[in-house]
């Protein structure tokens, strides 16, 4: 089952930004319980030039279905607001 998601932002605090961890909102998932079933799945983002960056969902973020995905190499800023595929 493939799910589309939107990249919301980097994981960050007031002073630090973790560029290899992204907050992703899967479409049609609106609760923490549904999002917890996605932990361990692969996340794929395709750049406009054709590069493919892969990450893994590591935990839930918040109560409305967002998740955190860790990538080996961080996503560029142009990925913010773009779609990813959750496999």
UniProtKB/Swiss-Prot annotation:
NCBIfam families recorded = PRK04337.1 (NF003326)
Q: Which family does it belong to?
A: Belongs to the eukaryotic ribosomal protein eL33 family.
Q: Which Gene Ontology terms cover its molecular function?
A: structural constituent of ribosome
- UniProt source species: Pyrococcus horikoshii (strain ATCC 700860 / DSM 12428 / JCM 9974 / NBRC 100139 / OT-3)
Which gene is transcribed and translated to give this protein? rpl35ae
Biological processes per GO annotation: translation
HAMAP family in alphabetical order: Ribosomal_eL33
What keywords tag this UniProt record? Ribonucleoprotein, Ribosomal protein
Q: What is this protein called?
A: Large ribosomal subunit protein eL33
């Amino acid at each position: 089952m493939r799910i589309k998601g939107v990249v919301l932002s980097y994981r960050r605090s007031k002073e630090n930004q973790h560029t290899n961890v992204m907050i992703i909102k899967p479409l049609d998932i609106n609760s923490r319980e549904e999002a917890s079933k996605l932990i361990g799945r692969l996340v794929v983002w395709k750049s406009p030039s054709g590069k493919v960056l892969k990450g893994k969902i590591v935990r839930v973020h918040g109560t409305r279905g967002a998740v955190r995905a860790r990538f080996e190499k961080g996503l560029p800023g142009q990925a913010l607001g773009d779609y990813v595929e959750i496999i």
